[in-house]
């Protein structure tokens, strides 16, 4: 299994629609102002956070149960940025829609700009033949409110190509998050 380069990422995005919308370079400024970078890097792709957020609140719940998750545990918010309460988290989705090839698995890591501020970005791997918008989780590990920005980079996706195609892909087994479009809550 080998990590894939910027050339491979560009080819797969442009010829096979693996990432839409796709940025072939690295964007560091927008309208003359510095932003958290996004787009193609040497061996990965820096994804952006969209304007849709679900901010966790403990007003209605006493226990967080992944098998029986209460949608009232979140407050929906839309904007150019989101403030995450201290020691809490928010969900968002990517601007980009992904179509992962059958012989590829991705690993997604948070950007150091956020990590250095105590904001951890968590995303599970994108499995072979998974497609959809990625649901992102931002954890504020600090005792202060934390700000995250829509339309700017938040995490980097690394693409690994297997030596052969898998016998059963995410699509083959009808994975529960296949084709997700908005910020998707846990499904047991």
UniProtKB/Swiss-Prot annotation:
Name the UniProt key words of this record, in alphabetical order.
Answer: Hydrolase, Nucleotide metabolism, Nucleotide-binding
Q: Which Enzyme Commission number(s) are listed?
A: 3.5.4.13
Which residues of this UniProt protein bind dCTP?
Answer: 111-116, 135-137, 156, 170, 180
Q: Which reaction does it catalyse?
A: dCTP + H2O + H(+) = dUTP + NH4(+)
Q: Name one Pfam family in it.
A: DCD
A GO molecular-function descriptor: dCTP deaminase activity
Q: In which pathway does it act?
A: Pyrimidine metabolism; dUMP biosynthesis; dUMP from dCTP (dUTP route): step 1/2
Keyword Ribosomal protein among UniProt keywords: no
Disulfide bonds, paired cysteine numbers? none
Q: Which GO terms describe its biological process?
A: dUMP biosynthetic process; dUTP biosynthetic process; nucleobase-containing small molecule interconversion
Q: Which Gene3D superfamilies match?
A: 2.70.40.10
> In the UniProt entry, which residues are flagged as the active site?
137
State whether keyword Nucleotide-binding applies: yes
**Function summary:** Catalyzes the deamination of dCTP to dUTP.
Spell out the subunit comment: Homotrimer.
Q: PANTHER family recorded for this chain?
A: DCTP DEAMINASE (PTHR42680:SF3)
What family classification does the UniProt entry report for this protein? Belongs to the dCTP deaminase family.
Q: What is this protein called?
A: dCTP deaminase
User: What is the gene called?
Assistant: dcd
């Amino acid at each position: 299994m080998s990590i894939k380069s910027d050339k491979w990422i560009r080819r797969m995005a442009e010829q096979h629609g693996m990432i839409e919308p796709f940025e072939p370079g690295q964007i560091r400024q927008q309208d003359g102002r510095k932003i958290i970078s996004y787009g193609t890097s040497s061996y990965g792709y820096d994804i952006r956070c969209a304007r849709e957020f679900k901010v966790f609140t403990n007003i209605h719940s006493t226990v967080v149960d992944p098998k029986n998750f209460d949608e009232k545990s979140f407050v929906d918010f839309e904007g150019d940025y989101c403030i995450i309460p201290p020691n809490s988290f928010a969900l968002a989705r990517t601007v980009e829609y992904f179509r992962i090839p059958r012989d590829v698995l991705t690993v997604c890591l948070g950007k150091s700009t956020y990590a250095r501020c105590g904001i951890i970005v968590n995303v599970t791997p994108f499995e072979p033949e998974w497609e959809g918008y990625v649901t992102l989780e931002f954890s504020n590990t600090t005792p202060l409110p934390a700000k995250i920005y829509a339309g700017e980079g938040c995490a980097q996706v690394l693409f690994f190509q297997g030596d052969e195609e898998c016998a059963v892909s995410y699509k083959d087994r009808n994975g529960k998050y296949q084709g997700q479009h908005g910020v998707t809550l846990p499904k047991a």
